[in-house]
Amino acid sequence: MRPKAVWEPEYHRVFVDLCVEQTMLGNKPGTHFSKEGWRNILISFQEQTGAMYDRMQLKNHWDTMSRQWKIWRRLVETSFMNWNPESNRFRATDDDWANYLQENPDAGQYRLSVPHDLKKLEILFAGCNVEVKNDEVSGVRKRRRSCYEEEDEDNQSMCSSSNPQTKGYWSPSTHKLFLDLLVQETLKGNRPDTHFNKEGWKTILGTINENTGLGYTRPQLKNHWDCTRKAWKIWCQLVGASSMKWDPESRSFGATEEEWRIYIRENPRAGQFRHKEVPHADQLAIIFNGVIEPGETYTPPSRSRKKLLHNRSESPQWRDTTPLSKMHVDEAETSRQNGCYAESQEDRIDSENAQPLDDMKLMNDVMLQESPVFVEIESAKPMYSIGECIKSLNAIEEVEQGSELYMFALDLFLKREYREIFLELKKPSLRIAWLQRLQSTSFPIPTTT
């Protein structure tokens, strides 16, 4: 079974540009590209991204784009929504939106933002007519789904559903908001172990729906969390590989073309980072602090515990990397039961039943020490010393030495976890924002660790 295509923003951008190019060359005589057009798109896409998607996967993404375009055109061509192409905004009232979304819930994604690359999409879908039915604007839904249908839809995987909302449409701005909320809840202490608690998920769900109007469900957020975690895992393994020569100062790799070729051959999903780093790395470092670290291979605590109990002398199995975060739309091509490379029950750790990291630390340390790559990981791991933190703090001109914020930071440096977060935030402005956030919430002064 071939892997499911996961379309993160950079892949989507490359695909759209290639489609526009072939359209301008006359290789799209109708609603789809000719054989020559698809062949050119496929070859160029693989060369530019390193992702070995096949022709059918590209066609699936084209069909998804086409469906999204019809949703958009139907919305702007509905007279009472009052679309203004000059300002790129709708002048519809809240009641107008409520009525329209009742009949067309998939259009909710466009209430706060227009489609990305709108001008390019207009080129691609020029001449595609969208019928706007008169009864579509009545504000009354003629066919309501039963509660059972809605419940089933909520329980489906984002990847296997044809409904963009059930599938989970994660634009770059929505994904960024999701990460902001994850950071916020992490700093509030609502991620006691590897997953967020009920209070954390409740806050994230309410805030993201209030800001986007998309109506995400909790399973959708957890699914996106899992995929985001997997993307971070791929990145951490990549920067931790000595052959790739990652330089955190220049934020670039020093590996040769041959070294890249060898690494991607063994870790094909790392090809997405061949020409760019993982988006929002500073935020991800905070979110997954203590769970997945650069240079380390992540082993879930539940699995570590089972392995240790079954065979104390057994080295951990270093598993293959897993799919990239769905930061855009993931096409249908189900894998296992629910698609999206769903984790097995053994892999998935329920937040209410997960073993706290503190309790599992000793067992994880033992297992890592048994690994043949442990020495390399340990030698490359930063020390995160108090002296290192103070040196970095003194280098921030905006923070006056002896000020309230400065002294607050010194107190935070007593705890290793905060030293790690502070040093992983590479931008001075981000370090200041993090310190000010903690200070404004009357964060308790940690004890020495």
UniProtKB/Swiss-Prot annotation:
- Residue ranges for the region (Disordered) are 297-324
Q: Where does this polypeptide localize?
A: Nucleus
Record's subunit section: Interacts with RPL10A.
Query: Which stretches does UniProt call biased (Polar residues)?
Result: 314-324
Q: Which InterPro entries match?
A: LIMYB (IPR045026), Myb/SANT-like_dom (IPR024752)
- Top-level taxon of origin: Eukaryota
Which gene name does the record give? LIMYB
Function comment:
Transcriptional repressor that associates with ribosomal protein promoters.
**Myb-like domain location, by residue?**
162-225
Tissues expressed in = Expressed in seedlings, leaves, roots, stems and flowers.
Output this protein's name: L10-interacting MYB domain-containing protein
UniProt keywords, alphabetically: Nucleus, Transcription, Transcription regulation
Cite the source lineage.
Answer: Eukaryota, Viridiplantae, Streptophyta, Embryophyta, Tracheophyta
**What is the scientific name of the source organism?**
Arabidopsis thaliana (Mouse-ear cress)
